[in-house]
Amino acid sequence: MSSLSKEAELVHSALETRGLETPLRGQALVPEVRKARIEEHMTEVMKLLNLDLRDDSLAETPGRIAKMYVDEIFSGLDYSNFPKITLIENKMKVDEMVTVRDITLTSTCEHHFVTIDGKATVAYIPKDKVIGLSKINRIVQFFSQRPQVQERLTQQILIALQTLLGTNNVAVSIDAVHYCVKARGIRDATSTTTTTSLGGLFKSSQNTRQEFLRTTRHV
């Protein structure tokens, strides 16, 4: 990972140390090779489904899926895509909660490879550094662009921000609809799943925790 940014390496190391990194096999193939291999295998899957790839509507589907997997919905598996992070010295001595609400996210359930669609609320109490607000959204999006379970996704965002900001005072909450529940199995179209991960004062201080939870509209 020598070509990665310092921030990407720090976050990856922190997640590995805590056993919260997405399970990976090791050194990945270069993107173009991955796309070619996925296209080959997806062609076979579609044939096994008895689809006729000579039809002009289906002919390019294996290639489209391969490109989508590598470049888009699973791009967060590659730390070279980790967002460029802007950290600013906390010269104003901000010591109150900073909250970004309703961050849209789309991820993929790693059990069935169907959509997870939700929103995240992220808060932190600055110490020595503050982060550009859009970078919080980008970090949420980066970890969403992987096969995921919502519990791990919530914790990965928390650990990433704690690592970058140099403070434990971070909180993350995610509300999401899981299409593995909505579109198959029980086929429940109305239920949502909420996960919360709290650090520092958000865990130890009841007042701070309640203030955060009020921003998520859970209490």
UniProtKB/Swiss-Prot annotation:
- Describe the subunit structure: Toroid-shaped homodecamer, composed of two pentamers of five dimers.
| Record's protein name | GTP cyclohydrolase 1
Similarity-based family: Belongs to the GTP cyclohydrolase I family.
Query: Which EC numbers characterise this protein's activity in its record?
Result: 3.5.4.16
Alphabetical GO CC annotations of the entry are: cytoplasm
Question: Pathway listed for it?
Answer: Cofactor biosynthesis; 7,8-dihydroneopterin triphosphate biosynthesis; 7,8-dihydroneopterin triphosphate from GTP: step 1/1
One Gene Ontology biological process: tetrahydrofolate biosynthetic process
Looking up Pfam families in the UniProt record yields: GTP_cyclohydroI
GO terms (molecular function) for this protein are: GTP binding; GTP cyclohydrolase I activity; zinc ion binding
| Catalytic reaction annotation | GTP + H2O = 7,8-dihydroneopterin 3'-triphosphate + formate + H(+)
Q: Which residues bind Zn(2+)?
A: 109, 112, 180
Q: What class of enzyme is it?
A: hydrolase
Q: Supply the HAMAP family for this chain.
A: FolE
SUPFAM superfamilies (alphabetical)? Tetrahydrobiopterin biosynthesis enzymes-like (SSF55620)
The UniProt keywords, alphabetically, are:
GTP-binding, Hydrolase, Metal-binding, Nucleotide-binding, One-carbon metabolism, Zinc
